[in-house]
Amino acid sequence: MKYLKVLQIFALLLTIGCSSNPKPAIEPDRDIEQQVQKIVKSMTLEEKVGQMAQVNIDFFGEDISKKPLDAKFEMDETRLEQIAEQYKFGSVLNAPGRALRAEEWNPLVEKFNDVSLRHTGLPILYGIDAIHGATYTYASPLFPQEVNAAASFNRDIVRTMAEMTAYELRAANLPWNFSPTLDLGRKSSWSRQWESFSEDAYLSAEMARQMVLGYQGDDPNHIDQYHVASCPKHFLAYGMTNSGQDRTPAYVSLPELREKHFAPFKAAIEAGALSIMVNSASINGIPTHADHQLLTVWLKEGLNWDGMIVTDWMDIINLYTREKIATDHKDAIRIAINAGVDMSMIPHQVEFCPLLIELVKEGKVSQERIDDAVSRIVRLKLRLGLMERPNTYLADYPKFHGAEIRQACYDAAAESVTLLKNEGNILPLAANTKVLVAGPNADLMRPLCGGWSYSWQGDAVDRVLPDGVTLLDAIRNNSTTNVRYAAGVEYLNNRRNFEAEGNIDIQAAVQAAKGVDVMLLCLGENSYCETPGNITDMAISPNQQALAKALIATGKPVVLILNEGRGRIISSFVDGVKAVLHTYLPGTEGAQAVADIIYGKVNPSGRLPYTYQRYPHAMTTYDHKVSEQVETMEGAYDYNAVVSVQWAFGYGLSYTPFEYSNLRVVEGAEFKSGDTIRIAVDVKNCGTRSAKHSVLLFINDDVASVIPDARRLRDFTKIEFAAGQSKTVEFELSAEELAFVGQDGKWHLEEGTFTIQCDNLTAKLTCTQTTHFGYNL
C-alpha cells in the first residue's frame, strides 16, 4: 500500500504544469489537416487498426544474413498479398538480415507500396535503423557513430551527417529513419553508449536539434525527396538501467527525468521531429510503453505535439511476456494503446490487429483513441509526401555513394578523434618513424564501424568492404618506412560473442618490437549492438591488458589507439603508455583520419562527450553533486577533493597549446527572468600549427533549494584558429537557461550567485529575483 501511494504521488507530480496549452510544436498545415480528416473519416475500423501495425520484412521472405553476399532476398509475394488483404498493415521495417543494394531496395519498397495502395489506398511507411549513414544499404559510406558526432562538438558536422544520410536513404527508397538516439550515456557499461551522443543533456539536445533538421529539412510539414522523417529514440531514460545491462529497469528521480533526460527529446520535437520511439524497459517500476503520463501527458499534451509514437521491437507483447503487467497479449495491447502508443512494431504477431479490433468493440479502447493514432500515422505519410510520391529512385540521386559523402565521413571522423595523452609530445610522428602496429583492432574494419553497420551486430563489415582501409592500412599509407605488424591478440569475429578472442601470441608482438622507434597499440572492442553487447566487467579484456603490459615492458614508447564504443577501464597499464588517441567508432573513413592525426596532417580537436572512468566501483558523471567528491584522506571526508576519473567530460588535447584570458560578463552580471546574459572570453592559439578548438562554457548554481550539480554545460562553439591567432569568443544565454527542476516537477530560477567557468577561468553572475515556472520553460 505504501509503495502504491508513492507511485500515485509520483504520477501526480508528473502531471504538474501539463494542463497549460503551449503553442503547437509543429504548426499545423491546413491542407494536410483537411486531408487527414477526410482520409480517417473514410476508413473502416479494420483499415485503421491495420495502419497501426508495423511488420518486419522477414515476415515475407527468408533472412539472408547467413547466406553468401550475392544472395538475393526472395519476396513471398503470395504471402504479402494475403497479409496485406487480411490485416491491411501500414508500415514495414528493417532489412532482411543485412544490407541490400540500392538497386534492390528500390523495387522492394515499391512492391510494398503497390500492394498497400491496392488494398488500403495508402502507401507503406517503411522504417530503417540508419543511425550513422545508410547502414542497411550495401557498401554505403558510413559516418562515425553518434558518440563521435558529440565528440566533435561541432553542430555543423552533425547536421551534415544527417543531411547526407537522408539523401542516401531516399536514393534507396527509404523514407523513415529510426534516428537519432537521444538516450543519455550516463551508465558507462551500457551497451548502447556509443549509439548515444553524450552523458550531458545540453550537448545531446543541441546535437539532437541539428540531426533532426538535417534529416527532415526546415519544414516538417513538407519533407522533400532528399530528406526523411526522423524518429528520435528511446523515450525516455532508456540508458539509465540500474544494472548497466540493456533493456533493464531504471529508477530515476522526477527532477532528473524532467531536467536531463527529457531535454534532448524536447529539443528534437522543437526542431520538428515527426515521430518518437519508446524505451523498451521501465522507469520507476512502470514500463514506458504503459506509461500514459510520459507518452501522452508529457510528450503529446505537454509539448502540444501531433507526431506519432511507435513502439520498439515486440514491446507491446513484452508487457505480458517480460514485464508481467498484463494478463495476456490482448491486455498488453489495451494498456499500450491507451497509454499513447500509435503504432506497434509487432513485428510478426499479426494477431495484434484482430485483438485491437476486439478491444474497440468491447469499449476497452475508445474509437477516439484509434482515430487519434491513425490521424498521426496518416499525417506523417502526408508530411512525407508519400501520397503524391510514394517511391524515390536511385537514378534521381547522382551524388549517391559519391566523393562528397566520403569526404564528409572523413571530416566527421577527423574532428571527433580525441587526444587524451601526449607525453613528451611524442605525437605527431614523422613519416620515417619505424613503427610496430599491434592489437586486435589494427587490421579490421568491423571495430571501426561498430553495430548497425550493414547488419545488426556489424559483423558483416569486413565481408562487405574487403578493400576497406583499416588502421594498419592507413598507417602504412602515411609511413615512408616499412611498418611491422604483429596483432598479439585477435578477435574471433564471433557473431554471438563479440568479446571472443584467440590467436594469442603476445611474444610475437614483443619480438616484432625490436628495432622499431614507436609501437602503435590498437586496443578496444569488437562491434556489438544492444543486449549482445552486455558486459559484466568494465576493464578492457585480460588478453589486451597483458599485451599492453608486455609491450610497455620492452621500454619502447607505446602510443595507445583506443577503438571502442564505451570507455573500457585501462587504469592497470595506461600510465605506462606515452600517448592515448581515442577514436571511438569512426566509421568507414575513420582509419585514414586517425592515421592523418598520428602523422600530423590533421590536428586533433575532439573532446570527450562522456566521463572516462578510472575504477569500476567509482563511476560518476561530470555533473555530479559536490558531495560525491570524496577521494583522498583515508578514513575521513575531504570536501575539497576531486572525483577520481581517468579523464573528465570535455577533455581533449591538441598539438598546439591554447591560452584563455579575460573571462567577463558583457551583459547581465545581475539578471532576472527574461534577461539576456552575454559572456566573453579571449582565446589564443599559442602554437605554430593551425587548429580547430571547442570552447566550452560551464555555469553552476552556487546555492540552490535542491543540491546543485557541480557543473552544467550551458554552451559551446568550435572555432578554427591560425597559428598564433587570438579571438574573442562570445556566448549569449537567456536567464531561463540557468533554471533547474525542483522536487515539485517545476522549473525554478533562484536568487543568488552562479559560477561561470571557461577552461581554468571563473567569474560570477548574480540572479536578483526568484522565479517559479511551470512544466515547460
Enumerate the language-model features and the residues they cover:
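Bacterial Sec-dependent N-terminal signal peptides
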Residues: M1-I26
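Glycoside hydrolase catalytic-domain context in secreted enzymes
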Residues: C18-V741, H748-T762, T768-Q769, G774-L777
